[in-house]
A protein has these predicted regions:
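Short, flexible helix-loop junctions that flank or precede catalytic/ligand sites
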Residues: 1-251
């Protein structure tokens, strides 16, 4: 099976993820459970070939240098996928997270009305939190979609990688992918303040500098959206404070 056939099987079975790992058969995650596909185990050379075929030269160089890399990948008429490629003790590995081909709306998600109320706040920092697979990116995409359809402004996103692709409607949308359109979150956020955005989406608050820049953007008249990998809203505040040096925490 080639990668397109494996991904088609994954999508057909409504899997959230396709796992490729040297030494074992391909597996899919369905309803939270990881299940084997009824095909022979793949060796390192096979997995390596499958993932190399869909990577750009830059992605290949990153993988060879850092032993892991992230990127997005689309198959026309099927879906988009967020891909993480890595090495493990048996050889190459990769995980393909399925991204819906259409952006779900807040109504599709049955989101409470507070989500629309947050969007109407002119400035501030809106954080969507939760563990991996909890729907953070899907929720943010729905919020961006609502703004795009109902407001007039400039939406700037910085993502690693771009997951949901938005088409400008009432808003101008510029989506920047880390390592393709910018060197990093920090560089993109510094530049963002000179790009006249009304709304800024940061794919993930990963480190102190990114958090500082997101807070600065919120304090200087922008509505900033971001995700944080925490299990609750209360723990999110603690997580952000803990990132700062001891001397700055009381501030």
């Amino acid at each position: 099976m080639d990668i397109a056939e494996l991904l088609a099987f994954s999508v057909k079975n409504k899997a959230s993820d396709l796992h490729l790992s040297a030494g074992v058969p391909p597996m899919i995650r369905v309803d939270g459970d990881v299940r084997r596909i009824n095909v022979p185990a793949l060796d390192h050379k096979q997995v390596h070939s499958l993932i190399y075929d869909i990577m750009s030269d830059k992605q290949r160089r990153d993988y060879e240098e850092f032993f892991e890399t992230d990127f997005s990948f689309a198959i026309e008429g099927m879906a988009r996928f967020r891909v993480n490629v890595f090495n493990q003790n048996r050889g190459a590995g990769a995980v393909f997270r399925t991204i819906p081909s259409e952006v779900l709306t807040l109504e599709d998600l049955n989101a409470p009305k507070v989500f629309k109320e947050l969007i109407e706040v002119p400035v501030g920092l809106v954080l969507v939190t939760g563990p991996t697979g909890s729907g953070k990116s899907t929720t943010l995409a729905a919020m961006v979609d609502h703004i795009n359809k109902n407001e007039y402004g400039h939406i700037l996103t910085v993502e690693d990688p771009i997951e949901f692709v938005h088409t400008s409607q009432k808003c101008l949308i510029n989506q920047r992918e880390v390592h393709r359109d910018t060197h990093g979150f920090n560089e993109a956020l510094r530049s963002a303040l000179r790009e006249d955005p009304d709304y800024i989406l940061v794919g993930e608050l990963r480190d102190l500098e990114t958090i500082r820049l997101a807070l600065t953007a919120a304090e200087t008249g922008h509505l900033v959206f971001a995700t944080v990998h925490t299990s609750s809203a209360a723990k999110t505040i603690d997580r952000i404070i803990d990132v700062f040096p001891a001397g700055e925490k009381p501030m």
